[in-house]
Amino acid sequence: MTLKFEGYGYLITGSTSGIGQGIAKELLENGANVVINYAHNEDNANETRELFKQYENQTLFIKADVSNENDVKDMFDKISKRFGRLDGLVNNAVYDKIFSIEDLSVEEYRKELDVNVVGRWLCSKYAIPLLKESKRPRIINIASRLGTKPIDDSVAYCTSEAATMMLTQCCALELTPKYGIKVNTVSPSMTLTPFARKSYTEEEIKETANRNPSKRLGEVKDTVNAVLFLLSDKADYINGENLNVNGGILLK
């Protein structure tokens, strides 16, 4: 099965590291034009520029906070001027901090909801004028298995990921009949990104992997493959769904 992306245009939010960077890399290697978005980390952005140096003509780097409406509007203006088209939006930007319910502040709760829910809605909203002109328009929201199965000390994150799944369904219900835009969620479990490798010990990683029926943790490529399939013409009849990429961890 061949997935064709040459000449298509995509925005991947939060794409200077981890899963977002992996999605961008795969699309670039397949001939797509890709907008790389980041909010603050200039070091990651510069490393990604160097990594994608050979794709300079296919990339556009935009620093924008997805929870800030003016930033989002400006980002889509830049995309329109540079590429003049957009065929897919991958809402990958995320904010996640660990707090118990008692220790969680209003400011932190709002920050997680602003980035993880409001940000995904804002980007979807302002992507519509470009997406509706595409012959294969797609929106993919990257959520988490924690949107359906909560854990301790993550009330804000779990709530935001559950809300994202409903956002996906609402957008699919409204945007598909109007503009043909297909909207889906991809929900990975713990994934071995560079950040995860720094955040957990080898023993913690091994222990978590052993709890999974597949006896391993997710790799970036697992989520990348799911996203590229949903962006492709092979997934035209999949809409409003949540694709779990977790090795079967929700079965336990």
Regions found by a protein language model. Give the residues of each.
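Active-site helix of classical SDR
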Residues: S124, S160, T168
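Conserved glycine-rich cofactor-binding loop
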Residues: G9, T16-S17
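Substrate-binding pocket helix/loop in short-chain dehydrogenase/reductase
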Residues: S100-I101, S105-L113, E204, T208
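Alpha-helical segment proximal to the catalytic Tyr-Lys
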Residues: P129, L173-P177, D236
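Residue(s) in the substrate-gating loop at a strand-loop-helix junction
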Residues: S144
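Short C-terminal tail/terminal secondary-structure segment
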Residues: K149, K206, L228, N239-K252
